[in-house]
């Protein structure tokens, strides 16, 4: 019997796949548990419509990430911190502080985990910080740390 998997089934198929499985397995397990649906014309059309919808959403998400990248690369995030001799900071500037400043001054909401910083910023001046907005889109934000 041909079935469309509605959920991932270990060793049998992934969500959205169409596979031929034994009739008994399909009727007694997959269909009863709601893990699969019979692959008839109406279910096939539903699956195609769902795939098209997911592709549109993915394209829209990518487009939004590209727009956000353009916006972020034009900005400079201004932060103030106390520093000692030679421009070394007392403490450090973390991705959380950068996110808070972006939210406060530019109304841009980002997740602090999207910032790719090896270490926190520990000196005065300009620093470029990369932000992973989407698996295919990476932006660079300029952060300026000045004396408080």
UniProtKB/Swiss-Prot annotation:
An example Gene Ontology biological process: translation
Role: Binds to the 23S rRNA.
Protein name, as recorded: Large ribosomal subunit protein bL9
Ribonucleoprotein among keywords: yes
GO cellular component terms, A-Z: ribonucleoprotein complex; ribosome
Gene this chain is encoded by: rplI
Pfam families noted in UniProt: Ribosomal_L9_C, Ribosomal_L9_N
PANTHER family noted in UniProt: 50S RIBOSOMAL PROTEIN L9 (PTHR21368)
Sequence similarity: Belongs to the bacterial ribosomal protein bL9 family.
MF terms (GO), sorted A to Z: rRNA binding; structural constituent of ribosome
Lineage, highest ranks first: Bacteria, Bacillati, Bacillota, Bacilli, Bacillales
Keywords carried by this UniProt record: Ribonucleoprotein, Ribosomal protein, RNA-binding, rRNA-binding
